[in-house]
């Protein structure tokens, strides 16, 4: 349907308002550190990383994937955190109120767009949350695999800070084999690349050696600690 100039002007204003508003996602910092462990990543960086991974890894999926749909899904999936804030993957108390906070945020943020685009984004966000379609499963795989890779590269820094246990990571990723056995095998290799060094916390993560490093010199506090007790 052809739109009038007035309708186009209104539509563009709404789109610009949304574009400027979602710039705030750059100030929402996650608990995962960048690969160099210098600082934590923000939601914009995380979403960009997932979109790139979506292009690169689709051949490892068990089902055919609508790539364009997945890319939009991962680019918008965390926009609700502008209002709701980031809920750490292993924060049980935060998880209890997460859905309520994010539903309210979705109403406001996607409501800034022209109605048709707002409904499209809201539908994709709900599809991601439902975790049922091949695209939603792929998006979740990416959302789980990316922080695992960054924790591997950074020596498990965020896991060490939060006292995350091996069992928690396995539990969080228990549905990944539904989507890709190959990616799951790689994830298990990362998860299993840990050593127990504390009798007080037998499952606590401490990296023996990062899969991404090829040097005998301790690269970070965790590796240095392991060497000192080994």
Question: Predicted regions span which residues?
Answer:
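Alpha-helical, largely C-terminal catalytic domains
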Residues: 1-230
């Amino acid at each position: 349907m052809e739109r009038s100039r007035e309708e186009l002007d209104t539509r563009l204003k709404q789109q610009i308002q949304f574009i400027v508003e979602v710039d705030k996602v750059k100030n929402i910092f996650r608990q995962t550190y960048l690969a160099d462990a210098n600082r934590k990543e923000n939601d914009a960086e995380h979403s960009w990383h997932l979109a790139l991974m979506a292009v690169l890894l689709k051949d490892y999926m068990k089902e055919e994937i609508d790539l364009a749909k997945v890319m939009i899904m991962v680019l918008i999936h965390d926009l609700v955190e502008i209002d709701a804030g980031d809920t750490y993957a292993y924060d049980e108390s935060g998880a209890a109120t997460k859905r309520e906070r994010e539903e309210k945020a979705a109403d406001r943020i996607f409501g800034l767009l022209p109605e048709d685009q707002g409904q499209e984004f809201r539908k994709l966000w709900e599809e991601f949350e439902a975790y049922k379609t091949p695209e939603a499963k792929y998006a979740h795989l990416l959302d789980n695999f990316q922080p695992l890779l960054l924790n591997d590269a950074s020596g498990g820094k965020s896991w060490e800070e939060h006292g995350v246990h091996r069992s928690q990571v396995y539990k969080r990723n228990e549905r990944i084999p539904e989507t890709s056995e190959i990616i799951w095998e790689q994830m298990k290799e990362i998860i299993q690349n840990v050593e127990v060094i504390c009798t007080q916390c037998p499952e606590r993560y401490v990296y023996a050696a990062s899969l991404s490093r090829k040097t005998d010199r301790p690269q970070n506090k965790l590796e240095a600690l392991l060497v000192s007790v080994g």
